[in-house]
Amino acid sequence: MTVYTGIDIVEIARIKRAVERWGDRFVQRIYSPAEIALCAGRINSLAARWAAKEAVAKLLGVGMRGPGSSAHSVAFRDIETLTDDDGRPTVTLSGAARARARELHIESICISLSHDHGLAIAVAVASTSPAARRRMPW
């Protein structure tokens, strides 16, 4: 089994400034409709999900798609962080993020989110199956 990790921390004020400056244009470019509904305008929650997207991108070994991005990048909305019935955060991948996870033989991604003292943080951990490890060339 192989384990991949990613971590990100963001100042909540940075996300607040982006929302104030760009409004719905920013929010709809970065977050899925389900994330927008779940966060209900709470900046702390939006910031935690920003950190989640960055943390997952790091474990995938890619950047986030924006101006001047490389072929090894994913769109922000390709990484969606919602909650399960028990309130635990979950990650759903689509598009280029899902394709990259398949390349890495990732079976599951767990994520933890937190925000306090003006910061939001996310830690993401992904694992592959033992069978996928046997297929790797090293």
From Swiss-Prot:
Gene3D superfamilies reported in the protein's UniProt record: 4'-phosphopantetheinyl transferase domain
Single GO cellular component term: cytoplasm
SUPFAM superfamilies reported in the protein's UniProt record: 4'-phosphopantetheinyl transferase (SSF56214)
The protein's required cofactors: Mg(2+)
GO MF: holo-[acyl-carrier-protein] synthase activity; magnesium ion binding
EC number of this enzyme: 2.7.8.7
Family as reported in the entry's similarity comment: Belongs to the P-Pant transferase superfamily. AcpS family.
Record's protein name: Holo-[acyl-carrier-protein] synthase
UniProt source species: Roseiflexus sp. (strain RS-1)
